Amino acid sequence: DINGGGATLPQKLYLTPDVLTAGFAPYIGVGSGKGKIAFLENKYNQFGTDTTKNVHWAGSDSKLTATELATYAADKEPGWGKLIQVPSVATSVAIPFRKAGANAVDLSVKELCGVFSGRIADWSGITGAGRSGPIQVVYRAESSGTTELFTRFLNAKCTTEPGTFAVTTTFANSYSLGLTPLAGAVAATGSDGVMAALNDTTVAEGRITYISPDFAAPTLAGLDDATKVARVGKGVVNGVAVEGKSPAAANVSAAISVVPLPAAADRGNPDVWVPVFGATTGGGVVAYPDSGYPILGFTNLIFSQCYANATQTGQVRDFFTKHYGTSANNDAAIEANAFVPLPSNWKAAVRASFLTASNALSIGNTNVCNGKGRPQ
């Protein structure tokens, strides 16, 4: 089997029948942090208790750091070959909540910052929400790529809060004033755990969280129900009040379509393949959009260029061929899970780099992978 796991954000997608091609074991969602460790150190026990299997790929919403890339290049690349890190799909980060009321909850960016810093501790602090009572934040307990995507946004946009947000995979470590301002904040593990805590009927209503869109609502239409999933981005433009947007895929696709490709000369560097949104631009950092839903990013795939087993090499190539294909691909499943497929120019760049046999980056290139390969 081709064994892999990691981020829970795309877990439902990768468990959708026929998304993973023949030879792939079922995806195991444990969080991006454990997924990266599992791949980088070939530690299958990050997925559970089994220590006898090898790890062949990972899913992560958290981009590999410079240190992670350098360590792998020094310790593993000489025997196993280069790693490949590419975006899989684009995603919003949704803000679902449990607080009954007839009004739509539409957060300005400043209000969103206030809720997650603890500055706004009562629902009455959100204008137009028509609700009152304590706000209780639910956050991911473990190292989470969804948390990284969310804290990137908070870091870029929440510049007038009493404290500052750092970009991190661990929410409890993000805000400079700690969790103390978030009275009664609740830690939960995994996307399933977060939604279970959010919807816990044994406690008073009032909880709010951040999560991927496939978990935020039971249906695609549910993402547009602002009595359960907040709109984000209300404000005043040229003296006219404007509503925020829902986290539905249609509201992030325009921003994704204009993200620039990595330069052809740089495509051997795994770092350049994953654009991130941030406060500053350049060096792979893209400005947050001025329109549409504002909290967005990518979930990524981490594979090896070389596998010791020829059958596994072919199976990985088959998956790339389908996932990044022009037709008979995974786009319908991606959209059904509330994500956005990569634009056609991005798919073409992935195919040209990692599937074209003559390209030195191609998966299983016999000249490059001669004597190298990730263990079977």
From Swiss-Prot:
Transmembrane segments: none
Cystine pairs: 113-158, 306-369
Keyword Disulfide bond: yes
Keyword annotations: Disulfide bond, Phosphate transport, Secreted, Transport
Pfam family name, one: PBP_like_2
GO CC, one annotated term: extracellular region
Tissues expressing the protein: Found in human plasma.
GO BP field: phosphate ion transport
Locations listed in the record: Secreted
Positions in coiled-coil regions: none
Subunit structure: Heterooligomer with human PON1.
Family named by the database record: Belongs to the PstS family.
Function description: Phosphate-binding protein.
Protein name stated in the entry: Phosphate-binding protein
Organism: Unknown prokaryotic organism
Phylogenetic classification of the source organism: Bacteria, environmental samples
